[in-house]
């Protein structure tokens, strides 16, 4: 399908280190729309965290089409019980996100509970070239 995806449920002794990594990724680097670390420190008190990372590859699908299809294909069972979602999307400067691609992110959040709080971050990563990186962190 032209997607690299990684899915991990974070728990146990590596929990704090994983949360530190998530917060660092969302608050550092070249962020067009940064997420403030104090806004997402609730992650340290979460009863569960599920992290999903997707990177599109050039192929027969448009880059966001393929990501949305993959997100929907491997929907987490905890998505409907989460009360927070963090979403980070990155592209390169030479291949920025278009408005039509941004609108497709509605597909990623449509099944969240209506009271879920969503924090967004948009960043630049020139190593991506014409690909898109999407990270979603569901928590409660």
State where each predicted segment sits.
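Tubulin/FtsZ superfamily GTPase core signature
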Residues: 1-140
């Amino acid at each position: 399908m032209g997607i690299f995806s990684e899915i991990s449920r974070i728990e146990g002794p590596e929990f704090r280190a994983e949360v530190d990594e998530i917060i660092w990724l969302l608050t550092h680097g070249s962020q067009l729309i940064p997420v403030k670390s104090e806004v997402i420190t609730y992650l340290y008190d979460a009863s569960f965290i599920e992290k999903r990372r997707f990177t599109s590859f050039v192929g027969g699908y448009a880059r966001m089409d393929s990501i949305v299809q993959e997100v929907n294909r491997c929907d987490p069972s905890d998505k409907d019980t989460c009360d927070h979602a963090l979403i980070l999307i990155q592209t390169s400067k030479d291949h920025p996100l278009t408005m039509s691609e941004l609108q497709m992110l509605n597909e990623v959040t449509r099944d969240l509970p209506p009271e879920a709080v969503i924090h967004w971050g948009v960043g630049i990563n020139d190593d991506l070239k014409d690909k898109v990186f999407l990270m979603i962190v569901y928590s409660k």
